[in-house]
């Protein structure tokens, strides 16, 4: 099986490059800017220790763990404060502001598993851009698959819980979600 789009060594094949994420940063930033403008993304300045403490407190109280709702402290930071903190060199990531409700379902057709119904994502304002300026898999998947006209994604079933995050991001950007197929790896520890 030969891909119809790729970059390998000195050979570039396809119409939708560049194919290396670090060469697509301006593209990702344009989409992030749009999400910030419509109130669906925000900078988060929480340190690793703060997030670990949050998780520990949620576990102790037998709550669902995650950076969401009232626990997402940076959701309410004003644009002015965020700009000041960024200009002062404070480290940050960009998070997607999920509007999911656990009681609502996202229904979609998985091409190998059939019609599936999963609760909307309401416990994770997923990181879209790391503090290194590169996008995370979740965000790159949505942007790249749209721009590269990907219609079908085949991946391991360990990614099934992420479908709700991805579909919500596609919809927030006004993009058509791809079709998914989630396959179980054989009895090995290989990941698809």
Protein language model regions, located:
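Active-site cores that bind ATP or allylic diphosphates and position pyrophosphate for catalysis
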Residues: 21, 34-180, 184, 189
């Amino acid at each position: 099986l030969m891909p119809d789009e790729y970059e390998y060594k000195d050979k570039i094949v396809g119409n939708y490059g560049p194919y290396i994420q670090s060469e697509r940063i301006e593209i990702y930033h344009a989409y992030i800017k749009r999400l910030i403008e419509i109130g669906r993304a925000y900078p988060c300045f929480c340190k690793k220790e703060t997030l670990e403490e949050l998780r520990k407190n949620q576990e102790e109280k037998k709550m669902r763990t995650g950076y969401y709702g009232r626990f997402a402290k940076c959701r309410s930071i004003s644009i002015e404060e965020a700009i000041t903190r960024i200009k002062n060199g404070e480290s940050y990531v960009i998070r997607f502001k999920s509007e999911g409700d656990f009681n609502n379902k996202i229904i979609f057709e998985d091409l190998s598993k059939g019609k599936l119904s999963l609760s909307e994502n309401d416990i994770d304002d997923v990181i879209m851009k790391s503090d290194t300026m590169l996008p995370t898999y979740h965000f790159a998947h949505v942007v790249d698959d749209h721009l590269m006209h990907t219609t079908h994604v085949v991946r391991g079933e360990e990614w099934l819980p992420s479908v709700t995050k991805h579909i919500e991001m596609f919809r927030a950007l006004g993009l058509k979600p791809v079709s998914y197929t989630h396959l179980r790896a054989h009895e090995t520890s290989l990941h698809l």
